[in-house]
């Protein structure tokens, strides 16, 4: 599925900031598989639907101007399902997962647990992809540098605290010290 020429075309289209549509779908497929397998659900269908849930093959940012489609978020599940059915044999669960992955933006709620999971993993992956982009925009030298600079401003330049605990990594203290001083 991931090597199908039609699926590989998703690499050409940006999706969330710098993440391609292909990478986003791969992320969703991975988390769908892991979560559904953990709960003893249909992990294979979850992974397949995750890989195909955004198979719309256009840059959605300019789509409205070109087509007049007012709300991409509400219409792209139908486009993705149409494209997926054209190239792949889908079961009913995979169809539902692709069609309802945008709930609550799309009005019909999911019927199966796997569909609820793709709804949540899609939001989670999208949030992480956007957050990762803006983290690098807002903190180009890393959050460690930002926190160390903030601590020095608040507590004074002579304050020495060796461990700034950050959930998203850190740079070496020598590098940060050179950038702050």
What are these regions (language model features)?
Residues 1-181:
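Metal-dependent phosphohydrolase cores
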């Amino acid at each position: 599925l991931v090597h199908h020429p039609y699926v590989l075309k998703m690499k050409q289209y940006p999706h969330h900031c710098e993440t391609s549509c292909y990478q986003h779908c791969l992320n969703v497929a991975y988390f769908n598989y892991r979560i559904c397998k953990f709960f003893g659900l249909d992990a294979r269908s979850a992974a397949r639907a995750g890989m195909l849930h955004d198979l719309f093959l256009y840059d959605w940012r300019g789509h409205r101007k070109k087509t007049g489609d007012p709300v991409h978020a509400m219409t792209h599940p139908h486009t993705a399902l149409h494209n997926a059915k054209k190239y792949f044999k889908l079961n009913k669960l995979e169809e539902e997962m692709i069609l309802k992955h945008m709930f609550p933006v799309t009005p019909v709620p999911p019927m199966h647990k796997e569909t609820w999971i793709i709804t949540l993993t899609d939001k989670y992956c999208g949030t992480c992809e956007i957050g990762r982009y803006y983290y690098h925009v807002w903190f180009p030298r890393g959050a460690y540098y930002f926190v160390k600079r903030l601590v020095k401003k608040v507590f004074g330049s002579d304050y020495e605290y060796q461990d700034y605990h950050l959930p998203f990594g850190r740079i070496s203290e020598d590098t940060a010290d050179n950038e702050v001083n």
